[in-house]
C-alpha cells in the first residue's frame, strides 16, 4: 500500500454482522492488515482484515461493533500488520490480551516492534530439542521429562486443577546450568474474572512475577483479542529467547477457549464448518502456534511450550486435543479418577507421554539412572493398576504374594510420587530417590529393567 492510500478514509461500510464489518470499493488491501476505525461519535477503534477480495474487505473489529453504523463509520487502512512493541522491561509485568498494561504500570518503551505472527523458520535452521527443564513436579520431571525447545500439552477437563498446576509450574520451573537465564511467558485466554484474580494474586504473592511476563484475556473480551493473545505471548517469548539469549517457557491456557473463538469468527464469516463446527483450517492455525517452540542454530535461547486445554466431556478424541496431539510431542493427561481420590496433581502417567524425554535424561542432564528407573517404575505401576481390576472380581485374598507387592507399589506410587503439595518443589534427584525407595516394595528378582550396577548404587538397603 502506498502513502496516498494510507491517508484515505473510507465511508463505504456496507454491512455489519457481529464483530465483522464489510467495506466495499477497496483496492490494494492485504490479509492481516491493521485498520483504524472512527465511530460516529468520534471514538477510535482498531480492526484487522480477515478477508480481501474483489474490492471488498472483511474486517474484524477488536473492540466490537456496538455503536457502529453503515453511514457514519470511517475506516482507514494502515498498510501494517499487527505488531507488538517488545522489551526486556516486560519481565515482571501483567498485560491484557492485546498487550496493554493491566497492572497499573507505565506503557512499555519498545526496544523493537515485531509482527505477532512471527517469522517462518527454515527447518534446516532448527536444532533438536535437548537439555532438561525442571518443573519441580515429579510426574512431569520423572516420567514425562520436559526438554528445552519441546512442545507438550496438558490435557485436562472441566473442574480439574489445571490452573493450580499451571501456576505451580510457572513458579517452580527452572533450567539447570550456571549462568543460564530463564523466564516464563504466561498467557491466559477466555478466563473468568475469578480465574484472572487467582492468576494475578498467585504470581504476585509467590514472587514468580519477577521472572515472568503475563497476558490475560477475559471471557468477555472480544473474540479477536483471544486470537491475538497467544501470538503476542509467543512473539514476546521469541524476543526474549532469540534476542536476549534466555530460555523461555511459554504456558498457554486455555486453548479450548482459543478454538471456540476461532469457531465464532468462522461462523460470523459464514464459512463452511469442519468437524463439530470448527473451521477446517483449525489444524493449520494450531500448528502456527505450536511450531513456534524450538531451538534455532546460532541462538543461545530456546522457546519451550506447555499449552493447556480442557477436553469437552473429557473426550480425548475431540477435534481440539486430537489435532493438538498430531502436532505436539506428547501429552500430559489429568485424570478425573485420581482427582476424585484427592490426589494432586492428578497426572495419569499411563496415557501421558513425552516423546522427547530421552533427550533430557541421563548423565550430565539429570542422572545416569533416570531412564532405567522410570521404565521400571512405569511397568510396575501399570501392572499394579491392572491388578486392581482383578481384585474387584476375585478379592485380594486370591492374589499371590508377588501380585500383592505390585498392588502395594501402585498405591504407594500414587500416594508418594504422584501426590505432591501445591507448594512442594522437588528436584529431579529427590524424585528419582523417592522412586528407588518405592522399588524396595517389589521382590529383587522383579527389578528386570535396571542393571545390577544401578541397583547396588541407588536401591536403599532394607
Swiss-Prot record:
NCBIfam families: PRK04196.1. It is found in: Cell membrane. Its main location: membrane. Belongs to the ATPase alpha/beta chains family. Keywords: ATP synthesis, Cell membrane, Hydrogen ion transport, Ion transport, Membrane, Transport. It holds the Pfam family ATP-synt_ab_N. Component of the A-type ATP synthase that produces ATP from ADP in the presence of a proton gradient across the membrane. The B chain is a regulatory subunit. It comes from Methanococcus maripaludis (strain C5 / ATCC BAA-1333). GO terms for biological process: proton motive force-driven plasma membrane ATP synthesis. CDD domains: ATP-synt_V_A-type_beta_C, ATP-synt_V_A-type_beta_N, V_A-ATPase_B. GO terms for cellular component: plasma membrane. This is A-type ATP synthase subunit B. GO terms for molecular function: ATP binding; proton-transporting ATP synthase activity, rotational mechanism. The gene is atpB. Has multiple subunits with at least A(3), B(3), C, D, E, F, H, I and proteolipid K(x). Gene3D superfamilies: 3.40.50.12240. HAMAP family: ATP_synth_B_arch. It is a peripheral membrane protein.
